[in-house]
A protein has these predicted regions:
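Catalytic-core regions of core metabolic enzymes
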Residues: 1-319
Length: 319
Protein backbone atom coordinates (compact mmCIF):
# COMPACT_ATOMS: atom_id res chain seq x y z
CA UNK A 1 0.00 0.00 0.00
CA UNK A 2 1.30 3.43 -0.95
CA UNK A 3 0.37 6.17 1.51
CA UNK A 4 0.86 9.93 1.82
CA UNK A 5 3.86 9.52 4.14
CA UNK A 6 5.71 7.59 1.42
CA UNK A 7 4.88 10.01 -1.39
CA UNK A 8 5.07 13.31 0.50
CA UNK A 9 6.72 12.86 3.92
CA UNK A 10 6.93 15.83 6.26
CA UNK A 11 9.88 14.29 8.11
CA UNK A 12 12.55 11.73 7.16
CA UNK A 13 15.19 9.83 9.09
CA UNK A 14 18.18 8.26 7.33
CA UNK A 15 19.22 5.26 9.41
CA UNK A 16 22.85 4.76 8.45
CA UNK A 17 23.36 8.28 7.12
CA UNK A 18 26.89 9.67 7.33
CA UNK A 19 29.42 12.09 5.88
CA UNK A 20 30.65 9.39 3.50
CA UNK A 21 28.85 10.01 0.21
CA UNK A 22 30.38 6.87 -1.29
CA UNK A 23 27.99 4.85 0.89
CA UNK A 24 24.23 4.56 0.26
CA UNK A 25 23.23 6.26 3.51
CA UNK A 26 25.60 9.16 2.98
CA UNK A 27 24.66 9.71 -0.65
CA UNK A 28 20.93 9.50 0.08
CA UNK A 29 21.39 12.24 2.67
CA UNK A 30 23.36 14.31 0.16
CA UNK A 31 20.64 13.92 -2.48
CA UNK A 32 17.98 15.08 -0.04
CA UNK A 33 20.06 18.11 0.90
CA UNK A 34 21.05 18.94 -2.68
CA UNK A 35 17.40 18.86 -3.80
CA UNK A 36 16.38 21.09 -0.87
CA UNK A 37 14.03 18.70 0.93
CA UNK A 38 11.76 21.03 2.90
CA UNK A 39 10.71 18.75 5.76
CA UNK A 40 12.45 17.78 8.99
CA UNK A 41 15.53 15.63 8.44
CA UNK A 42 17.30 13.38 10.95
CA UNK A 43 20.11 10.83 10.89
CA UNK A 44 20.79 7.78 13.02
CA UNK A 45 24.45 6.82 13.26
CA UNK A 46 25.99 5.24 16.39
CA UNK A 47 29.33 6.92 15.67
CA UNK A 48 28.32 10.51 14.92
CA UNK A 49 26.46 13.49 16.38
CA UNK A 50 26.03 15.11 12.98
CA UNK A 51 26.26 14.11 9.32
CA UNK A 52 26.62 16.67 6.52
CA UNK A 53 25.35 19.29 8.95
CA UNK A 54 22.26 17.28 9.95
CA UNK A 55 21.76 16.22 13.56
CA UNK A 56 22.56 12.56 14.12
CA UNK A 57 21.20 10.41 16.94
CA UNK A 58 23.20 7.49 18.30
CA UNK A 59 20.17 5.20 18.71
CA UNK A 60 16.91 4.78 16.83
CA UNK A 61 15.12 4.95 20.20
CA UNK A 62 16.30 8.56 20.66
CA UNK A 63 14.78 10.14 17.55
CA UNK A 64 11.51 12.10 17.65
CA UNK A 65 8.43 10.76 15.85
CA UNK A 66 9.04 10.61 12.10
CA UNK A 67 6.86 9.96 9.04
CA UNK A 68 9.33 8.20 6.72
CA UNK A 69 12.50 6.20 7.35
CA UNK A 70 15.18 5.23 4.84
CA UNK A 71 17.33 2.33 6.04
CA UNK A 72 20.90 1.86 4.81
CA UNK A 73 22.16 -0.59 7.41
CA UNK A 74 23.05 -4.32 7.42
CA UNK A 75 20.09 -6.60 6.76
CA UNK A 76 20.33 -8.29 10.17
CA UNK A 77 19.74 -4.95 11.93
CA UNK A 78 16.66 -4.01 9.91
CA UNK A 79 13.89 -6.03 11.67
CA UNK A 80 14.54 -4.58 15.14
CA UNK A 81 14.90 -1.09 13.67
CA UNK A 82 11.58 -1.47 11.86
CA UNK A 83 9.94 -2.66 15.09
CA UNK A 84 10.97 0.53 16.89
CA UNK A 85 9.97 2.78 14.00
CA UNK A 86 6.54 1.21 13.59
CA UNK A 87 5.59 0.79 17.24
CA UNK A 88 7.31 3.71 18.99
CA UNK A 89 8.02 6.44 16.43
CA UNK A 90 4.71 6.71 14.51
CA UNK A 91 6.57 5.93 11.28
CA UNK A 92 4.21 5.05 8.40
CA UNK A 93 6.64 4.70 5.48
CA UNK A 94 9.85 2.68 5.34
CA UNK A 95 12.31 2.36 2.45
CA UNK A 96 14.98 -0.32 2.83
CA UNK A 97 17.97 0.15 0.54
CA UNK A 98 19.92 -2.76 2.04
CA UNK A 99 20.38 -6.09 0.25
CA UNK A 100 20.85 -9.52 1.84
CA UNK A 101 17.22 -10.60 2.12
CA UNK A 102 14.96 -12.90 0.09
CA UNK A 103 17.22 -12.63 -2.95
CA UNK A 104 20.21 -13.87 -0.95
CA UNK A 105 19.39 -16.75 1.40
CA UNK A 106 16.68 -18.48 3.48
CA UNK A 107 17.90 -16.52 6.49
CA UNK A 108 17.52 -13.29 4.55
CA UNK A 109 14.04 -14.34 3.46
CA UNK A 110 13.05 -14.73 7.12
CA UNK A 111 14.33 -11.23 7.92
CA UNK A 112 12.26 -9.88 5.03
CA UNK A 113 9.17 -11.78 6.20
CA UNK A 114 9.46 -10.31 9.71
CA UNK A 115 9.79 -6.78 8.36
CA UNK A 116 6.81 -7.12 6.01
CA UNK A 117 4.68 -8.63 8.77
CA UNK A 118 5.41 -5.74 11.15
CA UNK A 119 4.70 -3.15 8.45
CA UNK A 120 1.44 -4.86 7.49
CA UNK A 121 0.35 -5.07 11.13
CA UNK A 122 0.92 -1.36 11.69
CA UNK A 123 -0.35 -0.02 8.35
CA UNK A 124 3.11 1.09 7.26
CA UNK A 125 4.13 1.40 3.61
CA UNK A 126 7.23 -0.65 2.79
CA UNK A 127 9.45 -0.19 -0.28
CA UNK A 128 12.21 -2.73 -0.86
CA UNK A 129 14.35 -4.17 0.47
CA UNK A 130 17.18 -4.31 -2.08
CA UNK A 131 16.23 -1.10 -3.90
CA UNK A 132 17.57 2.39 -4.66
CA UNK A 133 14.63 4.29 -3.12
CA UNK A 134 11.81 6.62 -4.14
CA UNK A 135 11.60 9.99 -5.91
CA UNK A 136 8.60 12.32 -6.06
CA UNK A 137 8.26 16.09 -6.54
CA UNK A 138 8.56 16.37 -2.73
CA UNK A 139 11.81 14.47 -2.15
CA UNK A 140 14.61 12.46 -3.76
CA UNK A 141 15.02 9.54 -1.38
CA UNK A 142 17.57 7.60 -3.43
CA UNK A 143 21.30 6.93 -3.16
CA UNK A 144 21.97 7.03 -6.90
CA UNK A 145 22.44 9.60 -9.65
CA UNK A 146 21.20 11.29 -11.75
CA UNK A 147 18.29 13.10 -10.14
CA UNK A 148 15.87 14.11 -12.92
CA UNK A 149 13.62 17.14 -12.98
CA UNK A 150 10.60 16.08 -10.93
CA UNK A 151 7.27 17.58 -11.99
CA UNK A 152 3.77 16.32 -11.32
CA UNK A 153 2.99 15.78 -15.00
CA UNK A 154 6.24 14.11 -15.98
CA UNK A 155 6.46 10.40 -16.72
CA UNK A 156 6.15 7.92 -13.85
CA UNK A 157 8.59 5.01 -13.55
CA UNK A 158 8.16 1.80 -11.55
CA UNK A 159 10.98 -0.74 -11.64
CA UNK A 160 12.15 -3.89 -9.92
CA UNK A 161 15.74 -3.04 -10.87
CA UNK A 162 17.59 -0.07 -9.46
CA UNK A 163 20.35 -0.12 -12.09
CA UNK A 164 17.69 -0.10 -14.80
CA UNK A 165 16.22 3.05 -13.27
CA UNK A 166 19.63 4.74 -13.42
CA UNK A 167 20.07 3.78 -17.09
CA UNK A 168 16.56 4.94 -18.00
CA UNK A 169 16.97 8.27 -16.19
CA UNK A 170 20.30 8.96 -17.91
CA UNK A 171 18.88 8.14 -21.34
CA UNK A 172 15.57 9.93 -20.76
CA UNK A 173 17.15 13.13 -19.48
CA UNK A 174 19.13 13.41 -22.73
CA UNK A 175 15.78 13.48 -24.54
CA UNK A 176 14.38 16.13 -22.20
CA UNK A 177 12.00 13.74 -20.43
CA UNK A 178 10.87 14.82 -16.95
CA UNK A 179 9.55 12.50 -14.25
CA UNK A 180 6.77 12.71 -11.70
CA UNK A 181 7.47 9.67 -9.53
CA UNK A 182 10.09 6.94 -9.48
CA UNK A 183 9.51 3.79 -7.43
CA UNK A 184 12.32 1.25 -7.07
CA UNK A 185 10.41 -1.70 -5.61
CA UNK A 186 13.33 -4.14 -5.26
CA UNK A 187 12.25 -7.41 -3.66
CA UNK A 188 8.61 -6.24 -3.41
CA UNK A 189 8.21 -7.46 0.17
CA UNK A 190 4.98 -5.45 0.36
CA UNK A 191 4.74 -2.97 -2.50
CA UNK A 192 5.45 -4.29 -5.98
CA UNK A 193 4.80 -2.98 -9.46
CA UNK A 194 1.12 -3.90 -9.13
CA UNK A 195 0.63 -2.00 -5.86
CA UNK A 196 2.44 1.10 -7.14
CA UNK A 197 0.27 1.01 -10.26
CA UNK A 198 -2.82 0.65 -8.06
CA UNK A 199 -1.81 3.80 -6.17
CA UNK A 200 -1.39 5.72 -9.44
CA UNK A 201 -4.81 4.53 -10.60
CA UNK A 202 -6.64 5.33 -7.37
CA UNK A 203 -4.96 8.73 -6.90
CA UNK A 204 -5.29 9.79 -10.55
CA UNK A 205 -6.45 13.38 -11.12
CA UNK A 206 -7.20 14.57 -14.64
CA UNK A 207 -4.84 17.35 -15.63
CA UNK A 208 -2.59 16.81 -12.60
CA UNK A 209 -1.33 13.21 -12.81
CA UNK A 210 1.18 11.52 -15.10
CA UNK A 211 -0.09 10.66 -18.57
CA UNK A 212 2.77 8.23 -19.26
CA UNK A 213 3.89 5.34 -17.05
CA UNK A 214 7.01 3.24 -17.63
CA UNK A 215 7.35 -0.23 -16.09
CA UNK A 216 10.29 -2.60 -15.71
CA UNK A 217 8.93 -5.92 -14.44
CA UNK A 218 10.77 -9.10 -13.49
CA UNK A 219 7.86 -10.82 -11.76
CA UNK A 220 4.10 -10.48 -12.15
CA UNK A 221 2.85 -11.71 -8.79
CA UNK A 222 -0.77 -10.60 -9.27
CA UNK A 223 -1.74 -10.58 -12.99
CA UNK A 224 -5.35 -9.58 -12.27
CA UNK A 225 -4.31 -6.56 -10.21
CA UNK A 226 -1.85 -5.49 -12.90
CA UNK A 227 -4.52 -5.84 -15.60
CA UNK A 228 -7.24 -4.12 -13.58
CA UNK A 229 -5.26 -0.99 -12.75
CA UNK A 230 -3.35 -0.76 -16.03
CA UNK A 231 -6.55 -0.98 -18.06
CA UNK A 232 -8.28 1.49 -15.72
CA UNK A 233 -5.47 4.01 -16.18
CA UNK A 234 -5.47 3.51 -19.95
CA UNK A 235 -9.22 4.19 -20.05
CA UNK A 236 -8.45 7.48 -18.27
CA UNK A 237 -6.09 8.44 -21.07
CA UNK A 238 -2.81 7.27 -19.53
CA UNK A 239 -0.36 5.42 -21.77
CA UNK A 240 1.74 2.60 -20.34
CA UNK A 241 4.91 1.08 -21.79
CA UNK A 242 6.63 -1.86 -20.12
CA UNK A 243 9.54 -4.26 -20.23
CA UNK A 244 8.86 -7.76 -18.90
CA UNK A 245 12.35 -9.13 -18.39
CA UNK A 246 13.27 -12.74 -17.78
CA UNK A 247 11.18 -14.08 -20.68
CA UNK A 248 13.82 -16.63 -21.72
CA UNK A 249 14.71 -19.63 -19.56
CA UNK A 250 18.15 -18.21 -18.78
CA UNK A 251 16.72 -14.73 -18.17
CA UNK A 252 14.16 -16.18 -15.78
CA UNK A 253 16.95 -17.77 -13.74
CA UNK A 254 18.82 -14.46 -13.68
CA UNK A 255 15.71 -12.61 -12.49
CA UNK A 256 15.27 -15.12 -9.68
CA UNK A 257 18.81 -14.54 -8.43
CA UNK A 258 18.41 -10.76 -8.78
CA UNK A 259 15.21 -10.02 -6.86
CA UNK A 260 13.83 -13.48 -6.08
CA UNK A 261 11.38 -13.17 -9.00
CA UNK A 262 9.24 -16.14 -10.04
CA UNK A 263 8.83 -17.03 -13.71
CA UNK A 264 5.80 -15.93 -15.76
CA UNK A 265 5.04 -17.72 -19.08
CA UNK A 266 5.88 -15.28 -21.87
CA UNK A 267 2.77 -16.04 -23.93
CA UNK A 268 0.65 -15.20 -20.90
CA UNK A 269 2.53 -11.92 -20.46
CA UNK A 270 1.92 -11.01 -24.12
CA UNK A 271 -1.79 -11.77 -23.77
CA UNK A 272 -2.08 -9.77 -20.55
CA UNK A 273 -0.33 -6.75 -22.05
CA UNK A 274 -2.45 -6.83 -25.21
CA UNK A 275 -5.70 -7.11 -23.28
CA UNK A 276 -4.78 -4.28 -20.90
CA UNK A 277 -3.40 -2.04 -23.65
CA UNK A 278 0.19 -1.99 -22.37
CA UNK A 279 2.87 -1.38 -25.02
CA UNK A 280 5.54 -4.04 -24.64
CA UNK A 281 9.18 -3.04 -25.10
CA UNK A 282 12.21 -5.32 -25.25
CA UNK A 283 15.06 -2.99 -24.31
CA UNK A 284 15.68 -0.02 -22.05
CA UNK A 285 16.42 2.24 -25.00
CA UNK A 286 13.16 1.20 -26.65
CA UNK A 287 11.26 1.92 -23.44
CA UNK A 288 12.75 5.41 -23.20
CA UNK A 289 12.06 6.15 -26.87
CA UNK A 290 8.47 4.94 -26.65
CA UNK A 291 7.81 6.88 -23.44
CA UNK A 292 9.27 10.05 -24.93
CA UNK A 293 6.99 9.70 -27.97
CA UNK A 294 3.97 9.01 -25.77
CA UNK A 295 4.47 12.32 -23.96
CA UNK A 296 3.25 14.04 -27.13
CA UNK A 297 -0.45 14.20 -28.08
CA UNK A 298 -1.77 11.23 -30.07
CA UNK A 299 -1.62 11.96 -33.84
CA UNK A 300 -5.06 12.13 -35.46
CA UNK A 301 -6.06 11.43 -39.05
CA UNK A 302 -3.85 10.29 -41.94
CA UNK A 303 -1.99 13.51 -42.69
CA UNK A 304 1.32 12.29 -41.27
CA UNK A 305 4.78 12.98 -42.71
CA UNK A 306 8.16 11.42 -41.99
CA UNK A 307 11.32 13.41 -42.73
CA UNK A 308 14.69 11.64 -42.46
CA UNK A 309 18.22 11.97 -43.83
CA UNK A 310 18.04 8.64 -45.71
CA UNK A 311 15.68 5.93 -46.97
CA UNK A 312 16.30 3.20 -44.40
CA UNK A 313 15.19 5.20 -41.36
CA UNK A 314 12.06 6.26 -43.27
CA UNK A 315 11.15 2.62 -43.91
CA UNK A 316 11.63 1.72 -40.24
CA UNK A 317 9.64 4.76 -39.09
CA UNK A 318 6.84 3.77 -41.46
CA UNK A 319 6.78 0.28 -39.91
Amino acid sequence: MVNRQLVSPKSIVIVGGSDDTKKPGGNTLKNLLDTHYSGELFVVNPKADSAQGVRSYRRIEDIPPVECAILAIPAKLCPDTVDVLCTKKSCKAIIILSAGFHEDSPEGAELERRIAQRCNETGTSLIGPNCIGVMTPDYAGVFTHPIPKLTRQGAALISGSGATIVFILEAAMQLGLNFSQVFSVGNCAQIGVEEALQYMDESYEEGKSSKVIMLYIENISDPWKLYRHASSLIRKGVRIAAIKAGYSEAGSRAASSHTGAMASPDKAVDALFRKAGIIRCYSRNELVTVASALMYPTPKGKRFAIITHAGGPAVMQTD
